[in-house]
Amino acid sequence: MSDQGFPRRQRLLTAGDYQHVFAHASFKVHGKGLLVLARPNALGYPRVGFVFSKKNVRRAVDRNRLKRLVRESFRLQSHRLPAVDIIVLARRGVDALDNATLHRQLHGMWRRLEKDVRKQSVASTPSP
């Protein structure tokens, strides 16, 4: 069976992990109702965490649906993502989007993040 799980090592688990990304976010990707913050890590694989507050997503059922969709989207795209720590933040109005729209939007956000990280790594690599 292929490695399609979502192991603990791919999650931001501690408050320190979150603080590190919030304090030193190198990349921001905006979408309708979502914001992705990311920072390179030295682990060799991407990790993700979520911030879906009651203020922005009122009902628990909607917060859980969003977490499930983002987690699944990340799981399917993680093999393409560079080694970064990612935080996905919900903004107001995201709970009004349907699942298909969210899935398309997340796919585009992962691609933009991948492109931005590649662009920065190429720019920071000195030429011979």
Swiss-Prot record:
Q: Which GO terms describe its cellular component?
A: ribonuclease P complex
- Domain of life the protein comes from: Bacteria
Q: Quickly give the catalysed reaction.
A: Endonucleolytic cleavage of RNA, removing 5'-extranucleotides from tRNA precursor
**Pfam families given in the database record:** Ribonuclease_P
EC number(s) stated in the UniProt entry for this protein? 3.1.26.5
Q: Which PROSITE patterns match?
A: RIBONUCLEASE_P
One GO biological process this protein is involved in is: tRNA 5'-leader removal
GO MF terms listed in the record are: 3'-tRNA processing endoribonuclease activity; ribonuclease P activity; tRNA binding
Keywords of this protein's UniProt record, alphabetized? Endonuclease, Hydrolase, Nuclease, RNA-binding, tRNA processing
Q: Which InterPro entries match?
A: Ribosomal_Su5_D2-typ_SF, Ribsml_uS5_D2-typ_fold_subgr, RNase_P, RNase_P_CS
Q: What does this protein do?
A: RNaseP catalyzes the removal of the 5'-leader sequence from pre-tRNA to produce the mature 5'-terminus. It can also cleave other RNA substrates such as 4.5S RNA. The protein component plays an auxiliary but essential role in vivo by binding to the 5'-leader sequence and broadening the substrate specificity of the ribozyme.
Q: What is annotated about its quaternary structure and interactions?
A: Consists of a catalytic RNA component (M1 or rnpB) and a protein subunit.
* NCBIfam families found in the cross-reference section: rnpA
Q: Which family does it belong to?
A: Belongs to the RnpA family.
Q: What is this protein called?
A: Ribonuclease P protein component
Gene that codes for this?
rnpA
